[in-house]
Amino acid sequence: MAAAGPRRSVRGAVCLHLLLTLVIFSRAGEACKKVILNVPSKLEADKIIGRVNLEECFRSADLIRSSDPDFRVLNDGSVYTARAVALSDKKRSFTIWLSDKRKQTQKEVTVLLEHQKKVSKTRHTRETVLRRAKRRWAPIPCSMQENSLGPFPLFLQQVESDAAQNYTVFYSISGRGVDKEPLNLFYIERDTGNLFCTRPVDREEYDVFDLIAYASTADGYSADLPLPLPIRVEDENDNHPVFTEAIYNFEVLESSRPGTTVGVVCATDRDEPDTMHTRLKYSILQQTPRSPGLFSVHPSTGVITTVSHYLDREVVDKYSLIMKVQDMDGQFFGLIGTSTCIITVTDSNDNAPTFRQNAYEAFVEENAFNVEILRIPIEDKDLINTANWRVNFTILKGNENGHFKISTDKETNEGVLSVVKPLNYEENRQVNLEIGVNNEAPFARDIPRVTALNRALVTVHVRDLDEGPECTPAAQYVRIKENLAVGSKINGYKAYDPENRNGNGLRYKKLHDPKGWITIDEISGSIITSKILDREVETPKNELYNITVLAIDKDDRSCTGTLAVNIEDVNDNPPEILQEYVVICKPKMGYTDILAVDPDEPVHGAPFYFSLPNTSPEISRLWSLTKVNDTAARLSYQKNAGFQEYTIPITVKDRAGQAATKLLRVNLCECTHPTQCRATSRSTGVILGKWAILAILLGIALLFSVLLTLVCGVFGATKGKRFPEDLAQQNLIISNTEAPGDDRVCSANGFMTQTTNNSSQGFCGTMGSGMKNGGQETIEMMKGGNQTLESCRGAGHHHTLDSCRGGHTEVDNCRYTYSEWHSFTQPRLGEKLHRCNQNEDRMPSQDYVLTYNYEGRGSPAGSVGCCSEKQEEDGLDFLNNLEPKFITLAEACTKR
């Protein structure tokens, strides 16, 4: 037993050793490529120092850890300082462990931090340089850290050309950051090709610099092609995320379901997209008021939703949220931005209206209507003056007769109960109503509260009044047989006093009786026939005969009722044939139908029985009757009946035996249509129709109009033609022609004048040059043709208007004609001119223009021009020697 104990302990130790070895080997992972990061000697906390390509080492890693607590590594390989770090001259390194829990594998990456120093290397052309065989003058990838801490100038990389193996090469660069803005950010050592940066760079301003590197010999020869040299600026998380709005305003309906979307907040980050620097997370920092959390925000989308249905506007109507957004996927070292979100809780119909009390009382006087009797207040916690607060009232019970109406006062939200139909105290002394109320808007869904219609009881007390008689029912009916004897008495209209429920003491009067057939007994209200009642006279037939009755009590209060008299029919009218005269066209028509009617009720009417009474043998031999239906019979003739008019007696009898005989005139005519024989069937004289009378009247009127026209024409021909009065009528005649006239020689005396030689031969002067007494005068003009006018007939001087009235002037159709105006003015102006041409002794005056007749061409007298009319001396010398009384006048006239 003692030996067994040591054996078990040795065996356990061996197993433990093997287990530890297995764990060590399982945890030992494959080492990936070492990464070297150039960093400054002093590192600030929470600053990125570089990025490691973790996917190249281990793509499926789901756990990333750092062996050095001073540094932390993110999922994208970014390496950050956890605290401020100062590097010594020695190199510092740490390991990044990458693990895959499912595959139970692990890899590690060694990160070496080197303190960067300025590189100063001088290389001569002859110096032997060890190179890789495949190195060529080609673009070299290069990058620099944003907001780098230096030291500056910061070495970026070395540029080498293949031509440097054979020549002494000098390097230079150009592009943005060198000779373009920002100037002098980069420079290159001319001999070595070392590229440096002189100051920090903001990636948000410049994310890449496209430089061009040149290699040339001492004599300016381009030893190689220009090299594109892009320098990419690595992003640093130096920009805080910013919300798009400083204050967001959202609304949410109260009692909303959990998960209801309230709104969306959004933030932006100026750092490089699709990196951890711009991977944002949203959260709620604070809610005011600090009630249980009612809202949540999606960390990635920023969608704010409700998490509870206890949003109650009547408790809290507005919430304020402080929203936070953080980059670096929400890790604690990410940068933060905040904003305020105001959420207003809008009203929903989640509060039912309630009555303040369960029962109400109201009073109303009987016979009153359209009066308000009660106001019912309502309590509702919803938002005032909205559909959720306004209510509708309903009378659920007690208003079967429609006496009441309830409405809502829009201002106070009270129920207004009114009486719209009079109440009768004797019938209903008290009315019980059940009133219900609900909101205009429907109740909100899914709310855990009772939404049944609230109810209240209203008791309406009717107050009694001493009112007049009542005519109830308003229309009463009575039956009377027609042809009842005058003076017959029948029960009439009955009214009653509601106070004693009988009609004692009431008086009755008749207000309206269409035919005057009835009188009313004032005391009893019975009706008495004053005329024979004929049902067939009343129009329309079979209608009730209505009489309006007035009932009056002792206080002269009254009511009005209608007594409807139903006149019962008796068989007092025999059937009657409608036709008086018929035409039968022989041989086209072999018969005619005879129709009969009976104004009595159908029970006293059809079927009718038609027959030919005992008549002459000729009628019985030539004519016969056969039944067609209950109201018609067919009258047929024999073939040997002659063409003439027959008078045939026909007897018609109804079902009760009432009969009547009528003489029917039948014209048996040779025709094709009955209208062809109607004119000859009349035994009386011809009667003119309305159109014939109208035609006669129009003919007479036309004859009178023709005679009147002839008479007016005769009187118009015998009446002398008058010359018009002076057409100018004391108005100015337009005469504004200022151009020279025609170049012609005309007589100065274009009017009817007396010649200077006092010739006794009369003439009508014209504008011509020749004259013929008593005949035609030829007028010769310089332009135009010849024009003939018939001169005034008769000798003597034509000085007056009447001298030419008896003449008849004929003017050729193709000649010029004078107007009436010219004919009227010519003799008058000629007479005026002739008188002015004479002195007191009626001799030609020397102070006037003398008239000379044209004597033909070649006259030794020559032509009389305008200058011949002017005297040799003006005779104005007397103005130079005025008398004293005229000197003052002359001086006044000569002043300007």
From Swiss-Prot:
The chain crosses the membrane at residues 691-711. Glycans are attached at N166, N392, N546, N629. GO terms for molecular function: calcium ion binding; gamma-catenin binding. Induction: Induced in the hours following cyclic mechanical strain in keratinocytes. It is a single-pass type I membrane protein. Residues 136-243, 244-355, 356-471, 472-579, 580-690 form the Cadherin domain. Residues 1-27 form the signal peptide. CDD domains: Cadherin_repeat (cd11304). One of its GO terms (biological process) is protein stabilization. May form homodimers. Interacts with DSG1; there is evidence to suggest that the interaction promotes cell-cell adhesion of keratinocytes. It is linked to Hypotrichosis and recurrent skin vesicles: A disorder characterized by hypotrichosis and the appearance of recurrent skin vesicle formation. Affected individuals show sparse and fragile hair on scalp, as well as absent eyebrows and eyelashes. Vesicles filled with thin, watery fluid are observed on the scalp and skin of most of the body. Mucosal vesicles are absent. This is Desmocollin-3. The lineage of its organism: Eukaryota, Metazoa, Chordata, Craniata, Vertebrata.
